[in-house]
């Protein structure tokens, strides 16, 4: 379908008929949004079911892949699904009308394909080439499109109106002496309201409505038409031509009034110049010029507002649809002020500790520099944003949205260290936050005006001081590009008066949730959590924005089924070599294995205990952090509870890929069979950043999932699903390599089952 054939000639329709059709199209668009929400809900349920079961490779295990029920050897053995070939129990089956059955996940996939109409779109794509053009869009564009003859008719009508004005110009000269000041005052007020967009262009007499995409050449064609229709050189014609020439300029010599798109009001110099005119011929010509300018500015304003291009989703929205990145936290400033438990937890989201150890790796040094820099630069650490006073005259559009270039714009906070690491302090959450949320459909701008907070908790009990700031995310995206922050305000009733801005289409905004959290900033320690608010935009009313108080809520750790988010997959191969098999290796090979156990003294020529080999094979569908849709990723590994920095293993950095292949082996020695039940293999994937903190892309933990390690309760023994099965399979088959594909966690915080 060519571009010209995408329009239908609907010029025969009257205005009320077009309005009725547009009303039907609007209802159709609303129903489509409702249907999209229903399909998204079904897709989320399907994703949750897949995540619950995981991608398992069952060779000898007798476990149902979905409900994890242990299968019997004779009775209730389970059968492989006819679609996915995974073994499931009798309760995880869905029988069809023809008697065949599928597992619950495959049945949901088939049901989603039918309900969403995907099968119809596939059949349509086979028969028709242009499947991306909807009939409703064609009708809507055809109605809003101006017919070819309407432009000429409009020019003729405007030219006739201009001729009528020239006929009455002589009478205007006579009345100037008596009511000139009143006329000028009225026109000036009319000009001010026109520049603000308050004057509405009247409908033409033909009964046809102007389209929303008028050309910018309309004004020029009007002036050329008005000049060509008049052949005589009377005084009134000369006056109209002179007025037309002055109107077409960007600034007027008689009034000094600049004609620009973004001018809200005329300057003081312009008003003074106009009011200081003397009566007579020049005065009447100025009045006619201003009157024409009012109408033309009104039309130009309507063209500019309606001719705004379609909303372009920012790079933040596109790249962050599936991203929830977290920052690799390394040494921070003045770590010796607080007690710590491990260095490992400082580099893993889920725990923030502050130890001061020797810098061994390059990225650790960079993280230390960035942390100190952010701590010393108060303005940068608290976010790059500008204030707007509460009583200031703020420029707003027709939806009560501040202009994008006003003094309420907020920028990304790129120099701060993330607080979303699972350690929120022990401050009791109290207080409320006052917000004004609005959305501009023309520019796709979401504006969160943070006014103030009241009755906040005290952030520092020793100093009885609260240095509060507000941080926001559009969930599920928690990447650095999606974070906004206000400046730091002192007191338990701080006044912020700052606007946090996001650029996102309204369709995507309906799938997002705004998370606003209040934090106490500690220059030499960790920030304390003071409360948060989560606002879902799926049913939010943007038509009537108003100020609203929201009660701050404490941080709630969600269950894994709710907080899980797809971050990609990691393929690894595990092999445990027990001590008895390790002893048969030659002495030279034993010494070579000894080298891989970093941080231990090489006093003994033999290795005590067994060896754990972890082959880091590859990853798929990692989060794209770089601007080109890629990441520079590497894997970091610990064998807990041994979390010393000297025992950390790292792969090389694979640049510019979201599907990296490392083919690197980690070797941990000194492991006995009883240690396997109490140890935990923690693997995290990071994006390498040259001059800032590394970005967390996902991770896994492999252990028995008992929650206990050597008789102590620990939060990192929390494996479940495929992580737990792969670790148990390795322990049950010593000396044998076992391969598994693991779903990456979006956060390394404790998973509560």
Curated annotation (Swiss-Prot):
Phosphoserine modified-residue sites: 147
InterPro entries, per database record: C2_dom, C2_domain_sf, FYVE_2, Rab_BD, SLP-4/5_C2A, SYTL1-5_C2B, SYTL5_FYVE, Znf_FYVE_PHD
Molecular function terms, GO-annotated: phospholipid binding; small GTPase binding; zinc ion binding
Low complexity composition bias: residue spans: 224-237
Ranges annotated as biased composition (Polar residues): 150-174, 214-223, 249-275, 380-391
Gene3D superfamilies in alphabetical order: C2 domain, Zinc/RING finger domain, C3HC4 (zinc finger)
Official protein name in the record: Synaptotagmin-like protein 5
Species annotation: Mus musculus (Mouse)
